[in-house]
């Protein structure tokens, strides 16, 4: 979709309409990583400028200044995600098969503590700066476990009544969590540690990734069942609009500075959406990526996006050994 700027002719006094072409993304490079295990979330520690890539029983760490691997956090049982509490210089890894959250030092990458949880399938995990607590979402238990980043102790396990996927904090006292098996969104009050509201997301089905625009108080939920991205009013819960995206979405990122939304999809595409206003959106690019490259992180400094995936044998889900990598895309 074209946006329009208006320049006024000094001499003629006439308005001249000039089209502005939206920024396109292109492939930049591939960063090869060791190992042949499964993979899930990626996340960027913006303070230390490191990229963390989940990979089977370990996390690969990439220095974003050089875009080279610098460490491996291993000895885990089945990692999913990591959340950063830079206030204590610690990362919190969700270890689904270990039924725990593993705490690591963000400078040395050494394990500090394993926090065993009364839950199963630890998956999505975020840091809430308002409460200075970690929220670890546990799929099989249909709950979220809350951890104090200072004491490294479990504060409470909250029943969600459905299978949680990813979540986002508004930084002001609320956490929003996609409930995949109910096609809804839970609003969690971080002060009372209770579910405050439930927002139905229809026509969205099977919501996974989620991002938040604090300026317009809009939520962006990526939905697998209908291959759509739903824009939701965070205050009322109203679904404003739904945009078409690729199949198998897993991650959603919002770049507030450039007003762009990215949805990474398992069908070898990343859908890029332009935010025209709080309630108006348009798809501006379907970026060709890699098959099953469905997880993503964005460096807000460079505007690069990072997606991870191995190569697969044709027509199968069998991984070709030694092919796991991070694929980097940048503005053209």
Residue ranges of model-derived segments:
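Bacterial N-terminal signal peptides
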Residues: 6-17
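Predominantly soluble domains enriched in secretory-pathway, periplasmic, or organellar proteins
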Residues: 15, 21-332
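N-terminal secretory signal peptides that target proteins for export/translocation
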Residues: 1-2
């Amino acid at each position: 979709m074209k946006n329009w700027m208006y320049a006024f002719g000094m001499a003629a006094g006439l308005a001249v309409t000039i089209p502005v072409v939206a920024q396109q993304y292109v492939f930049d490079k591939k960063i090869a990583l060791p190992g042949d295990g499964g993979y899930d979330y990626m996340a960027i520690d913006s303070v230390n400028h490191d990229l963390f890539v989940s990979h089977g029983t370990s996390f690969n760490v990439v220095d974003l200044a050089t875009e080279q691997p610098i460490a491996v956090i291993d000895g885990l049982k089945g990692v999913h995600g990591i959340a950063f509490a830079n206030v204590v210089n610690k990362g919190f890894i969700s270890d689904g098969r270990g039924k725990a959250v593993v705490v690591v030092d963000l400078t040395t990458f050494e394990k500090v503590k394993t926090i065993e949880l009364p839950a199963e399938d630890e998956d999505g995990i975020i840091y809430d700066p308002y409460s200075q607590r970690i929220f670890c979402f546990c799929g099989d238990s249909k709950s979220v476990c809350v951890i104090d980043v200072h004491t490294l102790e479990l504060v409470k396990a909250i029943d969600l009544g459905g299978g949680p996927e990813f979540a986002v904090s508004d930084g002001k006292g609320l956490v929003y969590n996609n409930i995949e098996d109910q096609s809804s969104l839970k609003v969690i009050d971080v002060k009372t540690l209770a579910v405050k509201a439930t927002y139905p997301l229809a026509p969205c089905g099977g919501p996974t990734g989620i991002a938040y625009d604090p300026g317009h108080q809009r939520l962006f939920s990526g939905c697998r069942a209908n291959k759509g991205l739903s824009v939701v009013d965070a205050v009322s819960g109203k679904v404003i609009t739904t945009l078409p995206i690729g199949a198998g979405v897993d991650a959603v990122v919002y770049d507030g500075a450039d007003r762009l939304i990215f949805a990474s999809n398992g069908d070898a595409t990343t859908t890029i959406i332009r935010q025209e206003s709080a309630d108006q959106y348009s798809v501006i690019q379907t970026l060709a990526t890699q098959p099953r490259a469905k997880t993503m992180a964005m460096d807000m400094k460079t505007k690069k996006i990072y997606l991870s995936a191995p190569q697969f044998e044709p027509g199968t889900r069998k991984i070709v050994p030694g092919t796991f990598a991070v694929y980097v895309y940048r503005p053209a």
